Each structure stands twice: as structure tokens, then as C-alpha cells.
Regions:
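A short N-terminal helical cap/helix-turn-helix that marks the beginning
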Residues: 1-22, 39
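Short beta-strand elements of ligand-binding domains
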Residues: 63, 86-87, 126-136
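Conserved ATP-dependent adenylate/AMP-binding module captured primarily in the ANL superfamily
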Residues: 88-120, 205-214
């Protein structure tokens, strides 16, 4: 059992490093500070709350490495949902299978990969969001996610009238023995198999990395 709580590691890091640079995409001038990342996560958490996403719901994520990929990942796990990262090299049939097999309710995806997928093959997905700007690319019939997205700035202002600050960071209380990620293998024998990872698994990697002189 790892002493440090996986979710609390994020919470403490954002608070302690608020003004420091956190993420920059290669070849881009835009840099997200830890505070920027925490604020983006708060927006996504508000979206999840308004859409009644529950703790333990699965949310799929596929795209090349980017700042917004990282932010989406962190937003899911710190909300208490389970992230399902999918290799961007998987073919569309494998992607459809993983999304359905994992019972993912939302999908964050790059625009290029979304163009290769078929909506009618992931019918249980309630909403699909672009990794370029988090706009809603698709919503299931009966959902009002696109309308909700238009009012998200207003809802953020209502919830945080003085702006989102370090003091507002409060993430899910989740024991390290809970599953936080389902990681699918490359599927060398048939379709991919899902490996369940707990907070202990990931906290162990983080705490070890902190001991390195990088």
C-alpha cells in the first residue's frame, strides 16, 4: 500500500505550484500554468456534474500526446470517474470495441480520429468532446450537452464569483485501492483486454519519480 493518496497528489501539486508552468505543446507558444490546468479541470468537473456523471463511470480518451489530453485525463481521475485511455494507433474497429466493452459514457477524442469513427457503433456514448478545445462533437439523442456547453462559462462564474483559486481545489475522496484507469492491451490475440489499475499502481509510479534527480 502506497502511503500517498493518488488523487491528493494532484490536489497538493496544483495548490503548491499554482503560478508555475505545467504543460506546453511542442512547437506551440501557449503554456498552461498549474493554475490554468486546475481551472480547466474545474470546468470539466462542472460539466460532469451537470451531466450527472457518477463516481466510477468510465470515460474514454484517445488522441496524440497534448496538453489537453493530459488535462482531460487528470479531470476524469480527480472527479472520481475511471479513465479509459486508448492508443491512437488502434484501428477504428478496435476503438469501437474498447469504448463499448469499457461501457464508457463520454469520449474525449482528437478531431482526426473522430472523423474515422462511426457514431452508430458507439451508441451508448452520451457525449463526444474534441481534444482541440473541448467543444461537443456529438451528443446522443435526448442529451442536452451542446446546450449546456454554451452556458458553462456562466455556470463557472456563478459557482466561483471571485474566480477559481487555489482554495477552491477539492477533489474526490478516493482510496488508493479503487480502480482509476482501465488500460487496454494491443490485442495480439483477438480484441484488446482491459487491465484495471488502482490508485496504488499509479501513485507508486509518481512517488518513485519524485525520488529521481531529474
Amino acid at each position: 500500500m502506497i502511503k500517498e493518496n493518488f488523487i491528493k497528489i494532484y490536489e497538493e501539486s496544483f495548490k503548491e505550484n499554482w503560478a508555475l508552468p505545467a504543460l506546453t505543446d511542442y512547437g506551440k507558444s501557449k503554456t498552461f500554468t498549474f493554475g490554468d490546468v486546475a481551472t480547466e479541470i474545474a470546468r470539466i468537473h462542472l460539466l460532469f456534474h451537470e451531466c450527472q456523471v457518477r463516481r466510477g463511470d468510465k470515460i474514454a480518451l484517445i488522441g496524440k500526446d497534448s496538453s489537453r489530453w493530459c488535462i482531460a485525463y487528470m479531470a476524469v481521475v480527480t472527479y472520481g470517474a475511471i479513465i479509459v485511455p486508448i492508443l491512437q494507433d488502434f484501428n477504428p474497429n478496435d476503438v469501437h470495441h474498447i469504448i463499448n466493452h469499457s461501457e464508457s459514457v463520454f469520449l474525449f477524442v482528437s478531431d482526426r480520429i473522430w472523423d474515422s469513427l462511426e457514431e452508430d457503433k458507439i451508441e451508448e456514448v452520451r457525449g463526444v468532446f474534441s481534444l482541440s478545445d473541448y467543444r461537443c462533437l456529438h451528443q446522443r439523442d435526448g442529451e442536452n450537452i451542446q446546450k449546456l456547453m454554451k452556458s458553462l462559462d456562466e455556470k463557472m462564474t456563478e459557482k466561483y464569483p471571485d474566480g477559481f483559486t487555489q482554495e477552491d481545489i477539492k477533489y474526490a475522496e478516493l482510496d488508493n485501492d479503487k480502480v482509476v484507469e482501465i488500460n487496454y492491451t494491443s490485442g495480439t490475440t483477438g480484441f484488446s483486454k482491459g487491465v484495471m489499475l488502482t490508485g496504488n499502481n499509479l501513485a507508486g509510479n509518481v512517488t518513485y519519480a519524485r525520488t529521481l534527480d531529474l
